[in-house]
Amino acid sequence: PFIYIKAYSFDIDERGMEKSYENMKDAYISTFDDIGLDYRIVKADAGNIGGDVSEEFHIIADSGEDLLAISDASDFAANVEVLEYEKDPSELDGQPSPDGKGKLIIKRGIEVGHIFQLGQKYSEKMSVSIKDSSGKGIDSFMGCYGIGVSRIVAAAIEQNHDDKGIIWPYAIAPFHVNVICLDPKKEEVLKECESVYQIIKDAGHDVPVSYTHLRAHETVSD
């Protein structure tokens, strides 16, 4: 299933909205950094949601649906949809970066997050107000923040796999330890495996136990 989580912020003025926006942006950055993904924050089209500021978080992947224009000499990055070029997006590779620094590199990305500064667009229509220090109601300045949880997992797999399967990033690995009991018919082996399992469990970790008669390297690969 596609799992997408949304959050909203409500502030009394534009400065507060901008601060909330930056706080949420930092939280997203921290999340993707902890997972260890290769990602970019890009300028984006606000679309039907609207707002003056809109940015997307994209995991770099050849299978991505979106085309991203990234400067090779600065932090500039944007979804090609917002670039004012007459050229076809596929022809933008090597063109001068809009910020005047370096040239554009075109990459594909998987969108896993989208954040907006909405201003008072919705609060005015829905009468969502906040009282100031004098008790006067002010239409709140809103921010909107979405993150695709299931897409993060899919993108992480896209960036971390080999011909034998998934190489889970530590931060989102289902388990950090797996006890493999080779030749469990031997009582001393089984006893030792159960002892190791209990030690790890007592330390507060979830740990699966695999009982197998395969050779060690075959079991680890599996």
Model regions and ranges:
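Single conserved hydrophobic/aromatic residue that forms the stacking wall/gate
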Residues: H213-D222
